[in-house]
């Protein structure tokens, strides 16, 4: 049993996280340590009694969306895309600049962009491929060069980039990349500048689903794989390690079932597809782990390809005091798909690595969405990405932000 920073007694077990039965909410510690971070009333952990009803608000989408869209040849060579899926959008506290890692052209290129204000983005010439902002040109990565069997290229299907300020300078940036095409080990690496990566390794024997990601739990100092699994439709399994690169050595015995949709997640009445958990991204925020629960409302890929429309996924925030058990007290979509024909955010709304950035009294939440292309009926052209930002103003003092008002 592990005693956490807030006095929660955390004991890993084989049971998945149940959002309706969170152990520390049912049996909170008698004394709660509130010395770490600002305390947020996102659940009932800090409340002994009340006659108030929580109200959960939605963010206001930025009127200037989308803030990044396919323009360059390497973003339009195939199905056009500028999509951090999950990628990463961060404000680098040391360099005082916004940074973004995203997918340029659907399932093809890994790109890097910067911004002075988090809204207007530039594509710097990085010199890796002359005149471009490409950072991992997949044709340069061969089985011989990196000694990675069955991995002859690096193409982003699902990625995460995390900034680690506590690491040695040449390991400040952590990369997770899953190639498209099925269930097989992902690729991990580290970097000193977020551009030139090294120490590439396969993530052990982890035959993960294509939409797997990773994150860091700063309260327990654990690196976590958020693994796409299929034990309850699309769902999630969990692995953790003290050292990031050590995750590569883990076997499947280290994996635990983590979370899935439940009976409170209702189908979209116009689609009728049983909801499934598509992806999970998480980040440490103040005194909690903040997560984005991406629900898939359908339909399946073959139906979308036939109609030239994106599948419908939407985002729902979730909260944890131990990093494993998450509550979802509000089951309404936080960032929803527009769904209607012609909308550039018609569907496939997805969170980013890092989830949000503090900006004064606001949280700026970055996400990506797809418009579809009904004129096309091929699987290559069905999904056209745009990156968008929305921000949300909370009625609170700077940085004292929460997601419900009591």
Predicted region positions:
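Beta-rich carbohydrate-recognition and catalytic domains
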Residues: 1-278, 283-346, 360, 367-406
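Beta-strand/loop-rich accessory regions of lumenal/periplasmic or secreted enzymes
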Residues: 330-332, 352-355
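Long, C-terminal catalytic modules of enzymes
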Residues: 352, 362-365
């Amino acid at each position: 049993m592990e005693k956490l920073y807030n006095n929660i007694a955390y004991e890993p077990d084989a049971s998945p996280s149940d959002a309706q039965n969170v152990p520390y909410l049912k049996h909170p510690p008698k004394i709660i340590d509130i010395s770490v971070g600002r305390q947020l009333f996102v659940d009932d952990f800090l409340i002994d009694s009340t006659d108030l009803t929580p109200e959960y608000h939605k963010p206001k989408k930025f009127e200037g969306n989308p803030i990044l869209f396919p323009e360059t040849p390497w973003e339009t060579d195939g199905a056009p895309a500028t999509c951090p899926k999950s990628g990463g959008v961060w404000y680098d506290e040391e360099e005082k600049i916004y940074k973004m890692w995203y997918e340029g052209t659907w399932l093809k290129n890994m790109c890097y962009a910067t911004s002075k204000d988090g809204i207007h983005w530039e594509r710097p010439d990085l010199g890796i491929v002359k005149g471009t902002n490409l950072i991992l040109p997949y044709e340069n990565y061969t089985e011989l060069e990196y000694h990675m069997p069955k991995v002859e290229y690096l193409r982003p299907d699902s990625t995460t980039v995390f900034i680690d300020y506590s690491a040695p300078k040449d390991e400040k940036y952590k990369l997770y990349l899953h190639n498209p095409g099925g269930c097989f080990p992902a690729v991990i690496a580290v970097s000193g500048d977020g551009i030139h990566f090294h120490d590439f390794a396969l993530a052990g024997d982890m035959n993960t689903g294509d939409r797997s990601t990773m994150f860091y739990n700063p309260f327990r100092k654990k690196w976590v794989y958020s693994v796409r699994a299929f034990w309850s439709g699309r769902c999630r399994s969990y692995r953790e390690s003290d050292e990031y690169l050590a995750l590569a050595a883990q076997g499947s015995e280290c994996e635990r079932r983590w979370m899935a949709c439940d009976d409170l997640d209702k189908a979209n009445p116009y689609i009728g597809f049983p909801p499934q958990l598509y992806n999970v991204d998480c980040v440490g925020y103040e005194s909690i782990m903040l997560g984005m629960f991406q629900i898939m409302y359908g339909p399946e890929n073959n139906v979308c390809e036939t109609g030239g429309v994106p599948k419908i996924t939407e985002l729902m925030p979730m909260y944890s005091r131990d990093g494993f058990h998450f509550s979802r007290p509000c089951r309404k979509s936080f960032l929803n798909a527009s769904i209607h024909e012609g909308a550039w955010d018609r569907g496939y709304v997805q969170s980013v690595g890092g989830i949000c950035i503090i900006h004064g009294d606001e949280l700026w939440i970055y996400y990506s969405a797809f418009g579809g292309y009904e004129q096309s009926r091929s699987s290559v052209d069905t999904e056209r990405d745009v990156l968008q930002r929305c921000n949300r103003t909370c009625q609170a003092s700077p940085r004292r932000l929460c997601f419900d008002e009591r």
